[in-house]
Amino acid sequence: MKKVLFATTALIATASVAAADVRISGYGRFGLDYNDANDRAVNGVSKTTITSRLRLQFDMSAETDSGVAFDARFRAQAESRDNTPGGAAFNGARFGVSYQGFRVNVGNIIGAVENMPGTYLETRTAGIGIDGASFYSHVGNVNNEFFNWDAYSSAGTGVNGVEFIYSTGGFTGHVSYSTRNGAVASDRIGVMGAYTFGDWTIAAAHQSSDAMWEDKTLVSVAGDLGQFGVRVAYADNDGISKWGIYGNMDIGSASNLLVFYTDESAVDAADVLAGRGDNRDNVAGSNANEGGSYGIHYSYDLGGGASLEAGYRRASNDNDTFQAGVYFSF
């Protein structure tokens, strides 16, 4: 099974069917999710529930006589979690223009931080299990301030931003910008650089935001060593640091086993007084995300774009989840 070292929520490749300048691709996944945070007597949700997602992706493109390419993408997605059924909805569109190694996107952009290699797991869901298990494995997710960076939204409208991407040889550079309407406009600026040499990729990204607690800097080093994959990552999330170590190995020709461990530092007490959430251990009202999280994931390739996926994750707040199911792409 080929290890994917650049899997992000925006860029996971799938097979597609081409018709003129329109391509349709997608995937489905469904399975069981055990989550010990649920309790029918407390929140009305069973500990074991069905989790599922069906996604259709539409890519349209046209190219001028001079070689300038124009493209657009949108998705339709139906998702159910915690046994709550969900209907299908279209997301916001992304438009792009590219020429040789340059690309400009507008609308529902990818985002520089989101596009950084070495931050998501090398699994089909980019996380643990069949739906990611809340992505505690990502060093940018701390203190219940998860996904507070610009990223392509598969189920929503996105941020309506603009981004510039340049790739040449083993180098990729990415700058993104977005602004949010409101009584006070809120801007985000992201920058990312990645370089691949041989079997190794190094990457770094930074986001500067007008919103409180959203500034962050991330770095990663990843190696694809044949049968084995190794990676380390670190992030400073506006004063809360988090590091992670990751490894995966192919077992035979059809199986892959992955493990990870991350550790999150405590929030500064002055930030809590200023209104930030509290992740510290042994503090009343804390989300208790300080400390270590770990997980293990197993994948078995069934052929034809289908695989069995199973994983266990223990979060730093002592939440346990186990998931198993089927993932198939088309």
At which residue positions do the language-model features occur?
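Outer-membrane beta-barrel proteins
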Residues: 2-330
